[in-house]
Amino acid sequence: MAFLDNPTIILAHIRQSHVTSDDTGMCEMVLIDHDVDLEKFNPSSTYGDSASETQGSNGETQGYVYSQSVDITSSWDFGIRRRSNTAQRLERLRKERQNQIKCKNVQWKDRNTSYSAEELSSLFEKKNFRVRSPCSGKQSILSVRLEQCPLQLNNPFNEYSKFDGKGHVGTTATKKIDVYLPLHANQDKLQPMTVVTIANAKVHDLIGLICWQYTSEGREPKLNDNVSAYCLHIAEDDGEVDTDFPPLDSNEPIHKFGFSTLALVEKYSSPGLAAKQSLFVRINAAHGFSLIQVDSMKVTMKDILQKALKRRKGSQRGSGPQYRLEKQSEPNVPVDLDCTLESQSTLEFCLVRENSSRGEEISEEDPQIDIATVQDMLSSHHYKSFKVSMIHRLRFTTDVQLGISGDKVEIDPVTNQKASTKFWIKQKPISIDSELLCACDLVEEKSPSHAIFKLTYLSNHDYKHLYFESDAATVNEIVLKVNYILESRASTARAEYFAQKQRKLNRRTSFSFQKEKKSGQQ
């Protein structure tokens, strides 16, 4: 053991002792004292004479020189040491193995046969690259493809190609639609063109995509460069355009409509053609009526009958019961199917089954339908939302948004952050298909600011009723809109609902009649 009073030597001894034992390097960070190092270069000025000052300075400087370890540096790079020989050797072996994988060893073998000088020269023939061979005139694959598809370069609808969903199937929501093109008037049977579009595209974008694909495939006749000249209509599976409904709104997203078959129709701006589009023929039947749109008064009654039978659910051409047309004002007088509509002097007819007759009480008193009523009926299938209050049991109400379209009725709760929902019923969203709707009736109308209506629909083989309240104007508009939709559709659920309602009424009437009969006998 040695007694030392020089802190510099003690610090150097501690540093050198921990070099080989401290793997973390923490001792180097803890024992680095910058204040001690500064005192070596700035000795105190309290020494008496210069000799002692010089001697002390030399001694401290010498102690500072020997106090620093070779492996320790007073910097932020402490703890960094050189790699060991084993690690360097392993790294070198790893690189050699990687280089051996890239190299291929070929074993030299003496040839068994002798080759002539000409054969040896042909193996490694010297080529003169300065002399270029004449161009053979062979076109590249890109040039051939550009010549085969000249229309793609001059396609005026290229801006709508970004809505093509064929390259996004599986990654983005897409929608596959069969589009009929009635522009081919000379073809007997139309073939649809399958278009795949992204789901967030609008109807206007879909029209542009259809025109782009039509032009890219080189179809004839050529289309108008203006996309606004076309519109999309609902079409049947055989390609017949359903003109009873207006075209799809060009500003609405395509995923809002559930139709898988559409038709691209050119708009008509001529006043004469516009008048033709407003020409409707009313066909009365046993359970409602249908509106058949015709192009002109020159159409034959046979065509009108075929359209009416096709509109009627379950009636197919060549099978099932046969029907005839009669004027609404002339019962039991069949109409000549070879005559034109212009010769009938009326736009209202009645569809009657063969070997049957309609009673005299059938509605000769029905008012003539005007064009305003037709427009209201056609616009009833457009989507529109209303803010109403849904009535629960115990007269609790919940604010909901009632969305009505020709396909379904949606009931979405309106979130109100200010109102406390602790003691109130939490309404869930409800979606009702139009095929399941049965009735929409006005329950009460107490004042212009308060009215209640009832919506009846089929759910799990049971009829459910929903009650709503709002102002009288909104309620009347909702009831009229829903009833227009119900009248234009041949719903099985609605027919069963009214049949069941009639049976209950008959049983009630029969029971009351028997009760009165027994009381009279007594």
From Swiss-Prot:
One of its GO terms (cellular component) is endoplasmic reticulum. Keywords: Cell membrane, Cytoplasm, Endoplasmic reticulum, Endosome, Golgi apparatus, Lysosome, Membrane, Mitochondrion, Mitochondrion outer membrane, Nucleus. GO terms for biological process: cellular response to insulin stimulus; negative regulation of Ras protein signal transduction; regulation of cellular response to oxidative stress; TORC2 signaling. A 1,2-diacyl-sn-glycero-3-phospho-(1D-myo-inositol-3,4,5-trisphosphate) binds at residues 393, 428, 464. It is found in: Cell membrane; Endoplasmic reticulum membrane; Early endosome membrane; Late endosome membrane. It is a peripheral membrane protein. Its main location: membrane. CDD domains: PH_Avo1. InterPro entries: CRIM_dom, PH-like_dom_sf, Sin1/Avo1, Sin1_N, Sin1_PH_dom. Phosphatidylinositol 3,4,5-trisphosphate (PI(3,4,5)P3) promotes MTOR activation by relieving MAPKAP1/SIN1-mediated inhibition of MTOR that takes place in absence of PI(3,4,5)P3. Residues 139-267 form the CRIM domain. Residues 279-353 are annotated as: SIN1-type RBD. Residues 43-62, 310-330 are annotated as: Disordered. GO terms for molecular function: enzyme-substrate adaptor activity; phosphatidic acid binding; phosphatidylinositol-3,4,5-trisphosphate binding; phosphatidylinositol-3,4-bisphosphate binding; phosphatidylinositol-3,5-bisphosphate binding; phosphatidylinositol-4,5-bisphosphate binding; protein kinase binding; small GTPase binding. Residues 382-487 form the SIN1-type PH domain. Component of the mechanistic target of rapamycin complex 2 (mTORC2), which transduces signals from growth factors to pathways involved in proliferation, cytoskeletal organization, lipogenesis and anabolic output. In response to growth factors, mTORC2 phosphorylates and activates AGC protein kinase family members, including AKT (AKT1, AKT2 and AKT3), PKC (PRKCA, PRKCB and PRKCE) and SGK1. In contrast to mTORC1, mTORC2 is nutrient-insensitive. Component of the mechanistic target of rapamycin complex 2 (mTORC2), consisting in two heterotretramers composed of MTOR, MLST8, RICTOR and MAPKAP1/SIN1. Contrary to mTORC1, mTORC2 does not bind to and is not sensitive to FKBP12-rapamycin. The CRIM domain forms a ubiquitin-like fold with a characteristic acidic loop, which recognizes and binds AGC protein kinase family members substrates. Belongs to the SIN1 family. This is Target of rapamycin complex 2 subunit MAPKAP1. The gene is MAPKAP1.
